[in-house]
């Protein structure tokens, strides 16, 4: 996924783990997760999808690798 992605409300984003390690998708920042989105651990070759229904900018990161982050812009 690019570090920034623009979508329209009610569109779904799918994260695909193309890595051998586990990852998560968590909205907010490492020191202040916002509780809106918290995936389980995503294993290698697995996918996680989420539909963004509201407009806004949603920062996300991986709880296991907090330097892996991005922003979904919904407008």
Say what each PLM segment does.
Residues 1-75:
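Extracytoplasmic copper-binding redox domains, predominantly the cupredoxin/blue-copper superfamily
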């Amino acid at each position: 996924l690019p570090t920034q992605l623009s979508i329209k409300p009610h569109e779904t984003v799918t994260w695909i783990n193309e890595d051998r390690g586990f990852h998560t998708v968590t909205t907010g920042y490492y020191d202040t997760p916002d509780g809106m989105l918290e995936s389980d651990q995503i294993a290698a070759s697995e996918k996680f999808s989420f539909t963004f229904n509201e407009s806004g900018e949603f920062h996300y990161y991986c709880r296991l690798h907090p330097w892996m982050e991005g922003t979904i812009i919904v407008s």
